Amino acid sequence: MSLVLRSLLDDGLVRETEHDPGGPHYGAVYYEADPEAAVVLGVDFGSRVVRTALCDLAGGVRAREEIRSRGSVEQRIDALASSVRSLLRTSKLPGDLLENAVVALPAVVSPADGRVSSADLPGLGASDLREQLERALRVPVTLENDVNLAAVAEQRRGIAHDVADFAFLLVGAGLGAAVMLDWKLHRGHNGNAGELDAVRSGRSDDVDPCSASVSQFAADLAARKETKLEPPFDVQEIFAAAGARDAVGLAVVEEAARRIALHVLPLAATLDLPLVVLGGSVGANPALLEPVRRWLAEWLPFPAPRVEVSALGEAAVIEGALAAGVDAALERVFQRRAQRRAS
């Protein structure tokens, strides 16, 4: 056994495994990276639902949970800490293996100092948010914009796999975009790149593709036209009605597509991207694809980008948080190993 392999084994970073069917059999001993050398926590800190998941260093998800909470940020953090304990019990992994956490926020996160601003949830912009989370979770915490993490996941495991340049447009309770250029997130100088909510601020509702505005548009149409749709005009029910050829449902989907295309338009015109991925509770509906593509083809004087729906659906944000967490955990694990070897 080489000294390098022995040191990795002593550090718990590799483990003995079964023989390779394609390799030699006589006296050979096989090793693999130990995915349980550490585990990471991913959190999608949404405005309505908080999603949590644990995964090992190989990216294997060991446990998941959803928390539906409308309480204060402090109450949500308490619920999050309780969820992590539940995840550890479910996964049967010891808590001391938890290496770090990545928390996705519906907010701008400064790339310089991690400061949170433009948050959809009151209290999320507290200056000590990361410290609150680290006290509750007892591990280092990284804060990141939720749409940025969705784009990371989509590039690694989704429809944008092996695509160097693309945009991810998340349309749900809020609106935001993430832009990947040459395989890297383009954050902007202050982390504000893709904050499309600021673009629609102060403008009329007929450019707003978010869930509340889409539901209100359905309610207005339902007051004048026959439909099977009923209050509160849930977005998913609207898309289901459109699939059943309900006239109001079809009209709402067409209008939602027009509004989404209005926000894809500047991305396509200024960045000349080959791909735009739609996600979120509104955006991730396949019924939007044909009308969005049609509107873009009509408006753009040059070929429109390919428009696709996220392959990961509502899991895109949490998957991105886990991917970022694994990257950070591997770096921390090997840094500690190097420090031990140097001392």
Language model regions located:
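ATP-binding/phosphotransfer module of carbohydrate and carboxylate kinases, centering on a glycine-rich
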Residues: 2-19, 23-68, 72-96, 203-343
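Short glycine-rich anion-binding loops that position phosphate/pyrophosphate groups of nucleotides
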Residues: 20, 106-109, 172-174, 282-283
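Short glycine-aspartate micro-motif
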Residues: 40-44, 98-102, 166-170, 176-178
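Short, acidic, Ser/Thr-enriched surface-loop or helix-capping motifs
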Residues: 56, 111, 180
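Glycine/GP-enriched mid-protein hinge/lid loop-to-helix segment characteristic of carbohydrate kinases
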Residues: 64-66, 72-76, 124-125, 132-147, ...
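Short beta-strand-loop/turn "lid" adjacent to the catalytic site in phosphate-handling enzymes
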Residues: 92-125, 275-280
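Short glycine-/acidic-enriched loop or helix-start segments at secondary-structure transitions
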Residues: 112-114, 153-154, 178, 287-289
